[in-house]
């Protein structure tokens, strides 16, 4: 039964440990998933900031006057919005799954209720709070996505909002530097919030570590106290074992004494049977004497005096017979008491040497009684001889009667002595009964003490087994807690390292982003200046071209007035030559203008390509970090 109980206990412990490990695994998985979703939401928020910054530049797109670069930018904006929307949907699905997992784990923890219930419940509360925060972020991103979709709808349909709203937007529109500053501040706020969350987690880990250290200290104290209690109980168990061994030795000695008493009682029973046979012989002899006395009465009836004497003698003989009967009854009672003694002695388990001495004295007294009976038999024989002698001689009757009276008196004295001896035997039997009763009580007390000692030893053994099992369980729990503490320390080290690494990466990426934003702004300003200078040059060239054409037209008119009277063939030749000169002059101007416009287009395309590539690289880098 004890082995079965132990097996059930160890199975329950193993099942409890497995449940705790499963709960911890689920909690770690939930924490990892929540961290993944929060990181992904941060990256999506950064992408949303970039899209909002683009939204301010996409006001004039979708019109007929817009260039293909603006259409390309609108397409990239649309693609990025679609990617952001799909990612937000995916994050929303992940949050639904996480919420279901949190509900499931909370139900399992409430059904189990093991030792780490408070810690696990706190971790679940933290994960639920982070899930609520991520839900709020998702809702904000969806609202801003709806605004971006509205702008895309206006761009696709080629319509814009009311002019008043456009004027208000232009009036209250933020500058690019303000937007950059605002985005940088938002990024810094998010990074500070993440650092605060990490510091909170570090504080929680430190508190958990302190609690685990306190638990380890308490378990070590409990194990030391249990070891002291087990040592004390083991000493008590050894004392009980020694006392049980002493009691077993005493019981063995008492059993040996009982066997000796049984042998002595068997000998006394044999002697009693011999005495019974002798008493029967005495009764037979007394009957024969009664017959002789009757014959003597017939002979003594002749003489009155002799008859009176014989009557007295008869009375004396009757009294002697009664005394003998009383002695027989006493002997029978003694036999019955001895039989009862035998029955009690069969149930007894202890004896004493004083009982042996009393039995030996009783045997000696029985032998003395046998000797007295022999003397009585001899006296009876003498009486019969004297009676026969009285028949022969009447003169000597008086003397013989006197002698007979003396002998009867002696017999009465002997009978009294036998009574006294029988009373002494009864007293000895009573003493024997009392001694036997005392021995029986001692045996019962010893039995009760032995049973109590056995029960105590059994309880001590059970307590030792329970203590050993609890000690082994405590050792296992201590080893498990130590391993857990080591793993938590390793996790803390990893978390610190990851925190430092993420902080370094964040700082480096912030620097890179700021540098890239500065480069983009400088390039944008340079390109705008180039466009402005090119536009001025274009205007100057157009003005020069117009002035040249007007001057040429005026000179040709003067020549015509001067040479009005010239021949028609000469005028046509001059006109053709002038047209050829204008064509030769306009061709290099057109080529220079077309080359400048192509360079401008190439610069704009390169700018858009660089911006798209930069956004794509940033997008890939952030999603690479999340994954």
Swiss-Prot record:
**Topology versus the membrane, per the UniProt entry?**
Single-pass membrane protein
Give me the segments passing through the membrane: 606-626
**SUPFAM superfamilies referenced in this protein's UniProt entry, alphabetically:** Tropomyosin (SSF57997)
Which compartment or compartments is the protein found in? Membrane
Q: Where is the composition biased (Basic and acidic residues)?
A: 580-597
Q: Where is this region: Disordered?
A: 577-597
Q: Which GO terms describe its cellular component?
A: membrane
Q: In which tissues is it expressed?
A: Ubiquitous.
Which keywords has UniProt assigned to this entry?
Coiled coil, Membrane, Transmembrane, Transmembrane helix
Q: Is Transcription regulation tagged as a keyword? A: no
Q: Name one GO molecular function term.
A: myosin XI tail binding
Gene Ontology biological process terms in this record: regulation of establishment or maintenance of cell polarity regulating cell shape
Where is coiled-coil annotated? 81-152, 188-218, 312-542
Q: How does it assemble?
A: Component of Ran complexes at least composed of WIT1 or WIT2, RANGAP1 or RANGAP2, and WIP1 or WIP2 or WIP3. Interacts with KAKU1. Core component of the LINC complex which is composed of inner nuclear membrane SUN domain-containing proteins coupled to outer nuclear membrane WIP and WIT proteins. The LINC complex also involves nucleoskeletal proteins CRWN/LINC and possibly KAKU4 and the cytoskeletal myosin KAKU1. Interacts with WIP1, WIP2 and WIP3.
Q: What is the recorded function of this protein according to its Swiss-Prot or TrEMBL entry?
A: Together with WIT1, required for the nuclear envelope docking of RANGAP proteins in root tips. Plays a role in nuclear shape determination. As component of the SUN-WIP-WIT2-KAKU1 complex, mediates the transfer of cytoplasmic forces to the nuclear envelope (NE), leading to nuclear shape changes.
Designated name of the protein: WPP domain-interacting tail-anchored protein 2
Species this protein is from:
Arabidopsis thaliana
């Amino acid at each position: 039964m004890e082995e079965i109980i132990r097996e059930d206990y160890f199975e329950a412990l193993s099942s409890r440990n497995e449940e705790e490990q499963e709960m911890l695994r689920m909690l770690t998985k939930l924490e990892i998933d929540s961290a993944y979703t929060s990181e992904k939401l941060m990256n999506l928020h950064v992408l949303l900031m970039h899209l909002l910054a683009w939204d301010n530049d996409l006001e004039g797109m979708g019109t007929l006057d817009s260039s293909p670069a603006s259409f390309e930018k609108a397409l990239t904006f649309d693609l990025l919005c679609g990617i952001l929307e799909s990612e937000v949907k995916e994050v929303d699905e992940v949050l639904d799954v996480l919420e279901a997992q949190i509900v499931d784990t909370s139900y399992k923890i409430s059904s189990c209720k093991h030792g780490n219930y408070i810690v696990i419940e706190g971790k679940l509360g933290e994960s639920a709070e982070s899930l609520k925060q991520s839900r709020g972020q998702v809702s904000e991103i969806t609202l801003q996505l709806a605004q971006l979709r509205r702008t895309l709808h206006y761009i696709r349909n080629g319509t814009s909002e009311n002019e008043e709203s456009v004027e208000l937007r232009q009036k209250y529109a933020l500058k690019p530097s303000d937007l950059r500053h605002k985005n940088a501040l938002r990024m810094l706020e998010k990074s500070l919030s993440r650092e605060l969350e990490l510091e909170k987690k570090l504080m929680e880990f430190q508190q958990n570590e302190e609690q685990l250290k306190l638990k380890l200290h308490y378990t070590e104290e409990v194990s030391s106290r249990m070891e002291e209690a087990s040592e004390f109980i083991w000493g008590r168990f050894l004392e009980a074992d020694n006392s049980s061994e002493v009691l077993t030795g005493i019981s063995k000695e008492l059993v040996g004494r009982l066997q000796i008493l049984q042998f002595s009682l068997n000998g006394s029973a044999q002697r009693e049977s011999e005495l019974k046979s002798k008493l029967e012989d005495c009764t037979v002899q007394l009957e024969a004497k009664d017959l002789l006395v009757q014959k003597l009465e017939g002979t003594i009836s002749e003489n009155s005096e002799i008859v009176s004497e014989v009557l007295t003698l008869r009375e004396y003989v009757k009294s002697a017979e009664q005394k003998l009967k009383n002695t027989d009854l006493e002997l029978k009672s003694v036999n019955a008491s001895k039989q009862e003694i035998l029955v009690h002695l069969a149930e007894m388990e202890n004896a004493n040497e004083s009982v042996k001495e009393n039995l030996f004295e009783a045997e000696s007294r029985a032998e003395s009684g046998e000797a007295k009976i022999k003397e009585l038999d001899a006296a009876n024989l003498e009486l019969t001889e004297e009676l026969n002698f009285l028949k022969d001689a009447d003169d000597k009757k008086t003397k013989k009667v006197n002698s007979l009276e003396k002998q009867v008196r002696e017999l009465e004295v002997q009978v009294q002595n036998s009574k006294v001896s029988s009373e002494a035997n009864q007293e000895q039997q009573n003493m024997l009964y009392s001694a036997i009763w005392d021995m029986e009580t001692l045996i019962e007390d010893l039995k009760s003490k032995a049973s109590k000692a056995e029960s105590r030893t059994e309880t001590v053994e059970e307590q030792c087994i329970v203590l050993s099992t609890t000690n082994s369980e405590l050792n296992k729990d201590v080893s498990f807690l130590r391993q857990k503490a080591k793993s938590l320390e390793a996790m803390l080290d990893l978390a610190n390292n990851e925190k430092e690494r993420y902080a370094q990466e964040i700082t480096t990426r912030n620097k890179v982003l700021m540098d890239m934003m500065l480069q983009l702004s400088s390039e944008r300003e340079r390109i705008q200046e180039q466009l402005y200078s090119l536009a001025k040059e274009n205007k100057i060239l157009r003005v020069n071209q117009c002035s040249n054409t007007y001057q040429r037209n005026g000179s040709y008119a003067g020549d015509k007035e001067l040479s009005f009277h010239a021949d028609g063939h000469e005028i046509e030749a001059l006109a053709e030559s002038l047209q050829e000169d204008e064509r030769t002059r306009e061709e290099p101007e057109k080529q220079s203008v077309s080359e400048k416009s192509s360079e401008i287009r190439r610069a704009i395309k390169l700018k858009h390509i660089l911006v798209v590539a930069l956004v794509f690289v940033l997008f890939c880098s952030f999603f690479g970090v999340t994954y």
